[in-house]
Amino acid sequence: MDNSTLVKPFKSINPWHMLGWLLVAQVMVAFIGRSLAPLGVLIGQDLALTKAQIGMLPAALFLGQSIASIPAGFIVDRIGSKRLLLYLSFGLGGAFMLMAISSNYFFVLLMVAIGGIGYGTMHPTSNKGILHWFQQKRGTAMGIKQMGVTLGSALSALLLLPLAAAWGWRMALLAACALLMATGVLAYRFYRDPPSAEPHEPERKISWSYLKESIGAMFRHKPLVLLSIAAMGLSGSQLILNTYIVLFAYEQLGLSLLLAGMLLVISEVSGSFGRVAWGIISDTIFKGQRLIVLVYIAALSIGIALMVTQLPEGISFWAIASVVAVFGFCISGFNGIWMNAATELVPFKQAGIASGFTLMVGSWGVIIGPPLFGYIVDLSGDFNYGWFFLSFVLLFVIVLLLWAKRLANKET
């Protein structure tokens, strides 16, 4: 770990105020991007989609994220976070507006993927902001910022699903996209990059040869590569839970659509608390040992996934909700620890591109995971086979994380 070249905070601005704007932007980006999970049932009914096709919607979003992650990380290392907050809000909002007025499934997938480019730009943009503004309590700050992802997802389930039931999913999504664009303008107006993050010419001119050199360095960094592959499993498992918990509860456990939607809210709210709690735990109890914390998260998630397979039809809502709450706390709470681990494994000046690299690799988990889970359920006719598949993936994740920790310890 080499973070010796740290940026001194800009004394006249409160870093927590800047964190507030990053959090607001993150909430709204997730509010739109993660709306595919709660709206998936209604979109599927409207377009007559199979479960595997519904799973392709978040997969397309994260395909866009994987395409954007490294270029976004490279650009934010050069121009800072402020302008990108505006650009990504309009990119995501505009693409989802076009998606909302189409009835062609393949055009919908294309617009979701283009929106994913804006969605994927948010993580390197906000991660760089956290690294610039926080030298202490960075795990806590990152957890608070990452809480915006699950909070935005929970709000989309809590607000967009009832609105979509009343107005139709298209009108509800159009209104939400307009709100995202307005938030992007406000974030651009009030967020500040510290002076040390400002671009300096000619040092900050974008060089594609330097980009290729930087990407090559990321691929040669074995602990970062192993962490990123492990993140594929963690991210895929998280999106499987978010994408299918409503369908699972509605179709297999017999809950109403409203109560099934509430399970997604519970999962995401629990994940929001998890992101902050795991950040505090990693800063205090584990003294910054992020990889070990990720091992604990994966192990707990395996236990909960196996417990889900034992839930009988007709079980009470509150019994299901308690299981889903713990599941969400773990599998939706890992992201801040992942981002901290990735950026702290590399020199500070490479933090943006390291974020982009690990997101690019990790995004393939959510591109492959939900459609594969849906295919397993379509083939078997039983969600339990899907949950067994998720447990096996997380077991492999633990092996990768322990390997990455061993290599990182050797390097230090």
Each language-model region and where it sits:
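C-terminal transmembrane helical hairpin of 12-TM major facilitator-type secondary transporters
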Residues: G288-A341
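Conserved MFS/SLC helix-loop-helix module at the cytosolic interface between two early adjacent transmembrane helices
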Residues: I67-F106
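Extracytoplasmic gate region of multi-pass secondary transporters
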Residues: L36-A37, K222-V276, N335, M339
